[in-house]
Regions:
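AMP-dependent adenylate-forming
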Residues: 1-18, 148
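Conserved AMP-binding/adenylate-forming
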Residues: 16, 31-73
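Conserved AMP-binding A3 loop
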Residues: 19-21, 139-165
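ATP-dependent adenylate-forming carboxylate-activation enzymes
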Residues: 26, 46, 67-80, 94-96, ...
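Short hydrophobic alpha-helices that are characteristic scaffold elements of the AMP-binding
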Residues: 56-64, 84, 198-202, 240
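ANL superfamily adenylate-forming
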Residues: 95-135, 243-253
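Conserved pre-ATP/AMP-binding loop-to-beta segment of ANL
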Residues: 125-143, 150, 174-180
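Conserved AMP-binding/adenylation subdomain of ANL enzymes
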Residues: 162-180, 187-253
Length: 253
């Protein structure tokens, strides 16, 4: 439903390219790390990377609910989220390991940990398919930043996501199979999650990761032939500032 084998490149980061066949095989392999029984929710606490995508879709393959967490969250906020939604498993990275461990230490319930940087499994080449999801079932829980108090979880159903997909692929043909979409904003936000991952991959497009929000990384990523950039005013201000700072340092202006 959300991921098909389009026989083309699905993910790009610098000179690394992952095709849809490899993507689906990796998702299936990641799903084998998750328990078969008593799995309702899985948290993802990591910076943007290929493994973030594998982890996310592996949760859906298990018919569980994905809970993305801001990789810059404090241990207190992570602990609050984990205690609030009580996922059975959390994916994390070396970059978030310290915060993750501090957060888990504050919990009164058990949670299994999977480090994305330590996963060593043979790629599964089983012809795996995603199970049909009930449109009314919860697909993902998105937590607010907690700027006005503790983070609050928003439950979105598969139907919520499908309505968004259809709005920009069928009703208005914004996303097409030939598009290359830049992944720049953190994927724990619903806007980039849908706009730079779920929607482009659902139509067979290619998503291209920028290593950072630095202007030089963005410019290098654009060389891959980007056709869609998803951003917010603050992001564009950062890009503008980076460019102006470079110009000022060069003495051109």
């Amino acid at each position: 439903m959300f991921l098909k084998d389009y026989k083309k490149t699905a993910l790009i980061l610098k000179d690394q390219k992952i095709d849809y066949t490899h993507l689906i095989n990796q998702v299936n392999s990641f799903s084998t790390l998750l328990p078969n029984n008593n799995l309702s929710k899985v948290a993802i606490f990591s910076e943007n990377r290929f493994e973030w995508v594998y982890a996310f879709y592996s949760v859906w393959m298990k018919k569980a609910v994905a809970v993305p967490i801001d990789f810059m969250s404090s241990a207190e906020d992570v602990s609050f989220i984990l205690n609030d939604c009580k996922p059975e498993v959390i994916f994390y990275s070396n970059g978030t390991k310290e915060i993750c461990e501090k957060a888990i230490a504050q919990l009164n319930h058990k949670i299994d940990k999977i480090n994305l940087d330590e996963i060593k499994i043979e790629e599964s080449k089983v012809n795996a398919t995603f199970p049909e999801a009930n449109p009314n079932e919860t697909a993902v829980i998105i937590y607010t930043s907690g700027t006005t108090g503790s983070p609050k979880g928003v439950m979105l159903s598969y139907d919520n996501l499908l309505v968004n997909i259809e709005a920009v692929t069928t009703d208005v043909n914004v996303y097409k199979e030939e598009d290359k979409v830049m992944v720049l904003l953190p994927l724990h936000h619903i806007f980039p999650l849908m706009g730079t991952m779920v929607i482009p991959l659902s139509v067979g497009g290619t998503i291209v990761f920028s290593p950072s929000m630095a202007s030089e990384d963005i410019m290098a990523t654009l060389q891959h032939g980007i056709t869609i950039i998803i951003g917010v005013p603050r992001l564009y201000n950062l890009i503008r500032k980076g460019i102006r700072d470079k110009i000022n340092k060069s003495g051109i202006a």
